[in-house]
A protein has these predicted regions:
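Short, Lys/Arg- and Gly-enriched loop/turn segments at beta-strand edges
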Residues: 191-197
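Non-heme Fe(II)/2-oxoglutarate
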Residues: 1-72, 77, 84-89, 117
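Secondary-structure transition/capping residues
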Residues: 27-28, 191, 219
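Peripheral, non-catalytic segments flanking oxidoreductase cores
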Residues: 2-11, 15, 216-221, 226-241
Length: 241
């Protein structure tokens, strides 16, 4: 995990916000991935995602970042997300069955200390591997009390609310949203969004995310990996500005 400060300028942020404003009608619904432990407050509808299309200003910004931090890498997949539900523990399915290393970068578009990404050290091939692992981990002692210091209510074990899955995972770090900053981590690391839904002043949360590396045909860029949501649209013939 690495936090990169000021990777986006104020002008870059406005480009992404305008990209969403102009094209949000092309966004698709992202549902809850299979295999995520059934915590409290987890719903099927997580967010709406708008793919960042080539030959746009938004794409050029991301392409320059990839070329700077991953020289020689020729593939990335980016999207603008408007989240309506705090994402529970998961890994990014872009890395499922990956032939080589893959990375995720999350970009903050706003200053908001109540918005956080919490990254743990454990690695999984896909979300379907998480629940059986956690069932075994819960048989042993917890290794932290992070659920007492961070907003992680949605990761509580619904069968026993005194237990929180995150307390059985090894923390790597916490990324607090500051406009223009980003966090880089292994796509297959388990991570979670802080439970911002508990604060009534927030109806949604915006971010930009990219995945970098050579993906497997089994990754979620293929429509079969979107669970309980809409298929990813083919943007080839869609006029996006």
């Amino acid at each position: 995990m690495k936090i990169i400060e000021n990777i986006l300028s104020a002008e870059d942020i406005q480009v992404f916000k305008k990209y969403w404003a102009d094209n949000h009608q092309h966004a698709y619904i992202n549902g809850k991935p299979e295999g995520v432990p059934p915590g409290i407050g987890v719903h099927d509808h997580i967010d709406r995602r708008l793919l960042v299309k080539e030959n746009t200003q938004a794409y050029s910004i991301l392409e320059n970042i990839v070329n700077t931090h991953f020289p020689g890498e020729n593939y990335f997949w980016g999207n603008f997300q408007r989240q309506v539900t705090s994402h529970s523990l998961h890994v990014d399915e872009f890395g499922k069955d990956r032939p080589d290393m893959t990375h995720t970068i999350i970009f903050a578009l706003d200053d908001q200390p109540k918005f956080k990404a919490i990254i743990f050290k454990e690695l999984f091939n896909s979300c379907q591997d998480i629940e059986p692992y956690m069932e075994e981990k819960l048989k042993g002692p917890k290794i932290s009390n992070i659920s007492k210091t961070e907003d992680l209510d949605h990761c509580a074990d619904w069968r026993d609310l005194t237990r929180n899955y995150c307390d059985w995972l090894e923390l790597e770090g916490i990324f607090t949203y500051k406009a223009g900053d980003a966090v880089l981590f292994d796509t297959n690391q388990i991570h979670v969004t802080s439970y911002w839904n508990k604060y009534p002043e927030f109806q949604s949360r915006d971010l930009v995310q990219i995945h970098v590396g050579k993906r497997s045909p089994n990754s979620y860029s293929d429509q079969t990996q979107i669970q309980k949501g809409e298929p990813i649209p083919d943007l080839t013939d869609i006029d996006i500005r």
